[in-house]
Amino acid sequence: MDKETIKAHKISDEEYTQILEILGREPNLLELGVISAMWSEHCSYKSSKKYLNGFPTKAPWVIQGPGENAGVIDIGQGMSAVFKVESHNHPSFIEPFAGAATGVGGILRDVFTMGARVVAGLNSLKFGDIHNEKCGKHQKYLVKGVVNGISHYGNCMGVPTIGGECAFDECFNGNILVNAFALGICKSEDIFYAKAEGVGNPVIYVGSKTGRDGLGGAVMASDSFNEESKSLRPTVQIGDPFSEKLLMEACLELFKTDYIVGIQDMGAAGLTSSSFEMAGRSGSGMKLYLDKTPMRESGMTPYELMLSESQERMLICAKKGYEDKVIEIFKKWDLDAVVIGEVTNTEKMELFWHDELVGLIPIEPLSEKAPILNRPISEPKYLSEIKDYKFELKSSIQELFIQMLQNENINNKAFIYDQFDSSVQTNTIKADGKLGASVIRIKENGVSVAMAIECNSRLNYVNPKIGAALAVASAGRKVACTGAKPLAISDCLNYGNPQNPEVMWQFAQGCEGIKEACKELNTPVVSGNVSLYNETEGVSIYPSPTIVSVGVLEDANKTLKASFEKENLSVYLLGESLGEFGGSMVMKIQDKKVSGSLKELDYKAELALWDLLYKANQNSLLECANSVGIGGIAMTLAKMFAISSVGANLTSGFDDEKMIFDESASRAIVGLSKENEETFLTLTKEFGVKAYKLGVSTSQKHFKLDSIELNKAELDKLYFESFQEQIQ
C-alpha cells in the first residue's frame, strides 16, 4: 500500500503498523477504507475516550447508559424516556441546509432505533459575529440555512422542536456548532438494542437506497478546516425527511413484533460502523454480500457501499425464518428491504462481492479496541493573561441595560423558533420563547418531562473545568425551575484540534468538570457525543460542552411557567450574588473582552435550590420561576417581564449597581402571591436558601429595576424586534 493512499485515509504510521499486526498482511483499499473510518476520531473517540471513562453513568432510574444509540431513563409507570444530543458541525458549515437537516435526521434515528417514538427536539446553535465586515454576511447565510434545514426535517417528520439556544461569537467565525437533541418515549419493556447474535440469523438492510453522498464523512469530521475545505460539499449527506418518516413508522410497526434480535441505524461511516458495532457488541462475526445492497447509482464499488453515509437507512439482525415477515413490513411502507448478510461465529467481518471474498477483517480490534491516544496536554498560556482582569462599570446603567437586552446573545429569537413546529403531536406544555426549560406532557402516564440545553462558551474559555460544571448545573437548574426533578444528562463536547496540547488540556478539564458536577448533582451521563477538530486555519473555537438535562414532574398540571401573569405578585431572588463577572456578557458587551476568573461551584447550594423549587411547587406556593443566567438578574427579569402581561417595580438592594449583571450560579427568580409568602419563606430557611424580595408585579405597563426605567412597549420592542433587524 503506497504512503499517499495511507495518508489520504488519515492513518498514522503507528496505526498502519497496528493494522499490519491485526491482519497479518497488507490491507487492500476496501479494508483500509473500513479501518480508517472505524478508527477515525468521529467513530473511535481515540483522543477523548480516556477522559470519558470516569463519567458517572448509573442511578436507580438509569436503564441504559452510554454505549448504545441513545440513553434511557425510567419516567414512571412502566414508561421510559430515550434521548441523546449529537453534533453535525462540520457538514453544517460546509452546506448549512443539508448539514443541519441530516443532523436532525441522524439524531431522530438514534432515538427511534431504540424502539421509542420521538416526541421532542431541541438544538444548540453557535455562529460567528454577524456584525463582522468580512464574514458577517456569510454568518447570516449560515444562520438562515441551518435554521431552514432543522425546521424542514423536523417539521416534515412531525416531531416538535420545542426549545434551544443560539449564541454568537467571533470564535465561531470559522466553525459553527450545530448540536441537535431528540427525546422519545416507549414502554420500558419494549427497548431495542444494537446487537447481532445467533449464528445463521439474517442481516437485513432497510430504508433508502445507497448513493455516493456522505462518502468519507466520518473522516472529514475528524479533521480541521482550511482553504481546501470548500471542495468538501460532496461529503455532506443529503436527507429526505419523508423517507425517514416512513422508516420510523415501519420500525415502530416492526417493534410490535418479535421478529428481530437487534437494530442499528447507519450513521457516521454508514454500513461499516453499523455492521461492526452490532457484531462487536455481541462478540459475533458477520458475512455481508455487498452486491445485494440497494444502490441509487450505477457502478458503485464495495468501498463506496461500505463507506457511503446516505441517510435514512438501518441494519437489522432478524430471527432466522422471520426475514420475509420483516421485509413485508418495510415493503408495505414503500422502503427497500433486502437480506444482505448473516451472523457467524468467526468474530470476523467477511465482505463479498458477487461471491468473491474482497475483505476479511477481525471485528473486535476495530469496534472495541481502537487505538487510544495519549495526546500531550498543557495549560493554555492565555489563562494567566486574562485571570486577573476585573470588570468595572464605565457607562450609564440604563444604556448598558438597553445594549444588553438587544444584543443577539440575549434578545428573543422568534425569527428562529417561529420556523419550528412546536405543537405537533399536541404534547407541548412549554416551548421556545417561554424561557428556561421546555416541557412535554406524557399522555400515557400523566407526568411531564422537562428538558433544557445549555452551553456558555465564554465561561468555558475562562475556566474549562468550572465552565463545564456550570453547564451541567445551569441545565439542571432550568429543569428545576419548571418544578421537575433533574434526573440525567446527555452531553455534546465541542472542542478544537486535539493535536494542540492546549486544546486537549481544555478537553480534559471540561471532562473533569462534568464528572464532578454530575456526581455531586446526581444527574448521571446516559448518552453523548464528542466533536473535535472545530478549528479553521489554526484557530480553534472556545471550549463548548453542550449539556442537556432531562427531568420529570409527576403531575404535568403543576408545570411552572417563567412569566408573571398577575399583578401584585411578590418577586424574589433566591440564592447568593457573589460578584461573578469572569466571562460575563456585560464584560463582553462593554469591554469587548472575555477575561477574568470563575469561583468554584457550590454544589450544596445548587442542590438546595433545586430541592426548594421542587418542594415549593409541590405545595403550590409558586406562580412562576426562572433560572438566573447570562446578563444576571437584570436580563433574567427583563426577559421574564417582556413575555408577561404585567409591569414591574423592583429594587435589587445591591450597594454596587453593576451587581444586577453579576452571573453567579445557583440563583433563580420566583413569583408568588402574597398569601403564600410566609409559608414560602419558612421553606427557604428549611432548605438553607437565601431569599431576597425585589418588589412586585404591577398593573402599570412599566418596567423599573433600581434606576433603570422603561415603559413596557420599549422593553418589548428591544427584546422582541431587535434580532429580526440584525439578521436581515
Swiss-Prot record:
- Any one GO BP annotation for this protein: 'de novo' IMP biosynthetic process
What does the sequence similarity comment in the record state about its family?
A: Belongs to the FGAMS family.
Q: What class of enzyme is it?
A: ligase
Annotated GO molecular function terms are:
ATP binding; magnesium ion binding; phosphoribosylformylglycinamidine synthase activity
Key words, A-Z: ATP-binding, Cytoplasm, Ligase, Magnesium, Metal-binding, Nucleotide-binding, Purine biosynthesis
Per the record, the domain of life is Bacteria
UniProt-listed Pfam families: AIRS, AIRS_C, FGAR-AT_linker
Residues that, per the record, bind ATP: Y45, K84, D491, G528
Which InterPro entries does this UniProt record tie to the protein?
PRibForGlyAmidine_synth_PurL, PurL_linker, PurM-like_C_dom, PurM-like_C_sf, PurM-like_N, PurM-like_N_sf
Q: Where does substrate bind?
A: S87, H88, N89, H90, R109, Q237, E309, S310, Q311, S531
| Gene designation | purL
Q: Name the positions where Mg(2+) 1 binds.
A: E86, N529
From the broadest rank down, the organism's phylogenetic lineage runs: Bacteria, Pseudomonadati, Campylobacterota, Epsilonproteobacteria, Campylobacterales
Keyword Metal-binding recorded: yes
Report the subcellular localization. Answer: Cytoplasm
Its Gene Ontology cellular component terms are: cytoplasm
Active site at H42, H88 (proton acceptor)
User: What's its EC?
Assistant: 6.3.5.3
Per its record, how is this protein called by name? Phosphoribosylformylglycinamidine synthase subunit PurL
Q: Where does Mg(2+) 2 bind?
A: D110, D265
Name the job this protein performs.
Part of the phosphoribosylformylglycinamidine synthase complex involved in the purines biosynthetic pathway. Catalyzes the ATP-dependent conversion of formylglycinamide ribonucleotide (FGAR) and glutamine to yield formylglycinamidine ribonucleotide (FGAM) and glutamate. The FGAM synthase complex is composed of three subunits. PurQ produces an ammonia molecule by converting glutamine to glutamate. PurL transfers the ammonia molecule to FGAR to form FGAM in an ATP-dependent manner.
Task: Write out the pathway annotation from the protein's UniProt entry.
Answer: Purine metabolism; IMP biosynthesis via de novo pathway; 5-amino-1-(5-phospho-D-ribosyl)imidazole from N(2)-formyl-N(1)-(5-phospho-D-ribosyl)glycinamide: step 1/2
Record's catalysed reaction(s): N(2)-formyl-N(1)-(5-phospho-beta-D-ribosyl)glycinamide + L-glutamine + ATP + H2O = 2-formamido-N(1)-(5-O-phospho-beta-D-ribosyl)acetamidine + L-glutamate + ADP + phosphate + H(+)
Task: Please classify the protein's predominant subcellular localization into one broad category.
Answer: cytoplasm
* Species name: Campylobacter jejuni subsp. doylei (strain ATCC BAA-1458 / RM4099 / 269.97)
